[in-house]
Every structure is written in C-alpha cells, then in structure tokens.
C-alpha cells in the first residue's frame, strides 16, 4: 500500500489530486475550530455534557466535533446528505425528475443544481432552529435579532461552503468529495474515542487485564471492519445466457453474462433513515427547550439510544427493537425502489436473455424477486448488527465510541471506493495497486 502511494506521487496528475484533497481536509479541520460570532461556546459545551443524548452525540461525531464547538461548520454536510436522499426518492416518485435522471449528463446536472438549492433551504431551516431554539436557552451571548440573523447566516453559509468543498474534491481531487468530508469528520474523533476507551479499560489496570482489554478492543474493531467489507463488497451473481441469433450470414449471441446483486444494496441509507426518524422528536424537544415531564419524558427515553441497552432499565430496549425494525424495513423499501425485477426481466426477454433453468418473463421476475428478498434480508441483518453493536457496548460497559456502527460503515465504504479509484488510475499506468496486495 505504501509502495502504491509512493508510485502514485510519481504521477504528476495523481499527485496533484491527492495534494488538493489533503489541502481541502486541512481547510475543513480549521473551519471546524472557528466559532460562530456571538455564540456562547462554554454554555453549549456545558449543556451538551449535562443534557445531551445519543442523537446529539452521533450528530457531533458525524460533524467531527464542529457541533460541540458550535463552529461555523456546525451543521456540516448533514443538510446536503438529507437533500440528496430526498432527491433520490423524488427522482423515483416524480416522472419529470426521473426523465432528467435519464437525460444523461445534462439531466444529472439539473438534478445536482436542484439538490444544492434544497440543501441551502434545509440548512437555513436547521440554522434557524438552532439559533432561535438554543439561543433562547443561552447559546447566544445576547439574544437579539442581530445575533440571530448573524448566526443563521453563518451556519447556513458554513454548510454551503462544505458542500462546495465536497464538489471541488470530486472534480479536482480523489474520491467522492462529500463522502471524503464525512470520513474526515468521523476519523477526527477516533483518537479521542480510543483515548477514552484506554482510559476506562487499560490505564491503571493490572498488566494482564490491560493487555487483554487491548486485544479485545482491537479484535472487535478488526472484526467489525471485516464484516463491513463483506457487506459492502459481497455480491450474488445471477448467470444470464443469451440465445443465438442469425443476423445476415452471421451467427451472433450465445454469450453469457450475470446480474450482480449486492448483499447490502441500500448501503448505509436504512440506518440514516431510521436514526433520523428516531431522533426527530429528540431534536425538536431540545430546540424547544423542553426536556419533557411525565409521559413525554418517558417517550424521549425510549427514543434515546443511551437507555436502550442499559441493564438496569431494560424496558427502554423497546426503542431499540423499533430501531431495528425500521432499519430492516428501510433496507427492503430502498432496495425495492432502486431495483426493479420486473423491468430487468422484461429487458432480458427483449434482448433474448434468460436465466438457466428459469423461463423468461414473469417466472424470471419472480425468481429475481425471491433471490433479492433473501439477499436483502442477509444484508439487513448484517447492517443491523453493525449498527446496534455500539449501543450494546455502550450500555454494558458504559463507553461510547464513534468508530463503530454507522460511522464504521461510512468509513470502510468510502475508503474502499477511494482505493478502487486510485487503483484504476494506477492500473492505467501499469502500476500494481492496492487490490493486488
């Protein structure tokens, strides 16, 4: 791997892309430390320590600590992620957007432009909720119209700026820019999380216990990475045979192909959807400054991941069961709108293709649907395990980490995709790359 990086730096074009990406990473980390003018950072850190919950802890991890610092990048690229998911769903639901998607490069540019506008609108809404909601509780040094407007403008501009950086990385750097931004944010929190784990389970312990703890910690991390790689790269290939045809004096066809069905077709989207729905009431209550009393207080605890796996309060595990059910549901839902067995079977029939042992047409679509449901179930269970494990770890050992669950899925997926992109560029120049190691 190091040899590959060394060889990559020998190529001027590739070296420029890598250096540009690293430069943008530095800009992002600097921006995450710049506070929003007029905001009381000490108050917010105190509030976060006393009242924060699992939803806000995850939000802070994804923003690389920008949220806790209440920096100009506090909203980060969350509005863009939400906007992209919304546009993906609308593209399938609205025929006009679907036509744009099929119009090639011009259509995709139009959809990208709409996504940017939706991102700014969502950022504006979230910034307003934060400035007004938290501002009334003491976040703003002076709660007046000028500070509110300044905070809203700064937070919205920060989110738009990160979106712009992500697009520039995609255009001039290595990998998908938005994904790179997300990974940098998550990775920036890992040293602190590892430090907390070592502080709790290693430092001050007897040598034998400390060594065992280190081995277990890294074994769990490596095991989860391997599982995520399997989920990300696992593929079931359905063989397809094409019948022979006579065109003029030539016999054509008779070729074989396959339909690749990924184990985790939906990626991390089911987890993001489930967490968004679970966290929405928690966010609204926090912005409104209402922690809840009586029944509502209990409802918030059922939705708070800190209580899900607490051995002393197992009744709140009902919230975890709801979370698991939503992940599985969204895995099937997202796959159903992105993969159409009936359309694929129809196209195969028109092209003279068939699955060996399966009749063309409806039997083929039924077979594909049956196999797809089986694969999606396996992927959903694996995805659920990876997403839920950190909550089990947190509940049993009272330790929270951001390098597990959703964060780990994102990191591994982006790193693998970026490695493949570098590998493809290296192979063009006859270099041995990552994937051969």
Locations of the language-model features?
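N-terminal cationic and glycine-rich segments that engage phosphates or anionic surfaces
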Residues: 1-101, 105-437
């Amino acid at each position: 791997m190091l040899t590959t990086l060394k060889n990559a730096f020998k190529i001027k074009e590739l070296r420029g892309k890598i250096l540009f990406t690293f430069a943008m990473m530095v800009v992002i980390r600097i921006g995450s430390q710049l506070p929003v003018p007029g905001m009381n950072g000490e108050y917010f850190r105190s509030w976060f320590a006393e009242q924060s919950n699992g939803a806000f802890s995850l939000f802070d991890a994804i923003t690389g600590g920008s949220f806790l610092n209440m920096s100009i990048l506090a909203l980060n690229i969350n509005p863009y992620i939400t906007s992209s998911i919304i546009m993906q769903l609308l593209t399938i639901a609205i025929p006009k957007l679907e036509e744009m998607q099929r119009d090639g490069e011009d259509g995709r540019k139009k959809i990208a432009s709409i996504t940017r506008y939706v991102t700014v609108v969502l950022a504006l809404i979230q910034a307003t909720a934060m400035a007004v909601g938290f501002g009334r509780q003491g976040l703003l040094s002076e709660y007046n119209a000028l500070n509110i407007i300044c905070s809203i403008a700064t937070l919205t501009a920060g989110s738009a700026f990160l979106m712009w950086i992500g697009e520039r990385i995609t255009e001039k750097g290595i990998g998908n820019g938005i994904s790179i931004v997300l990974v940098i944010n998550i990775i920036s929190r890992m040293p602190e999380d590892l430090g907390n784990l070592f502080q709790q389970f290693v430092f001050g312990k007897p040598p034998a216990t400390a060594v065992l703890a280190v081995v277990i910690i890294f074994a769990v991390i490596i095991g989860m990475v391997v599982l995520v790689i399997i989920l990300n790269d696992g593929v079931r290939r359905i063989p397809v045979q094409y019948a022979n045809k006579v065109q003029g004096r030539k016999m054509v066809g008779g070729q074989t192909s396959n339909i690749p069905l990924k184990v985790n077709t939906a990626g991390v989207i089911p987890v993001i959807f489930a967490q968004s729905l679970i966290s929405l009431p928690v966010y609204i209550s926090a912005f409104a400054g209402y922690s809840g009393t009586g029944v509502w207080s209990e409802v918030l605890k059922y939705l708070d991941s800190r209580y899900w796996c607490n051995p002393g309060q197992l009744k709140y595990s009902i919230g975890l069961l709801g979370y698991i059910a939503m992940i599985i549901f969204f895995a099937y839902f997202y796959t159903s709108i992105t993969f159409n067995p009936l359309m694929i079977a129809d196209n195969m029939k028109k092209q003279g293709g068939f699955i060996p042992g399966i009749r063309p047409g409806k039997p083929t679509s039924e077979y594909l649907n049956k196999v797809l449901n089986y694969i999606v179930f396996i992927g959903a269970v694996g995805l659920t395990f990876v997403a839920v494990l950190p909550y089990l770890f947190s509940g049993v050992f009272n330790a929270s980490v951001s390098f597990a669950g959703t964060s780990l899925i994102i990191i591994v997926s982006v790193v693998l995709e970026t490695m493949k992109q570098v590998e493809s560029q290296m192979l063009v120049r006859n270099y041995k790359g990552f994937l051969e190691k």
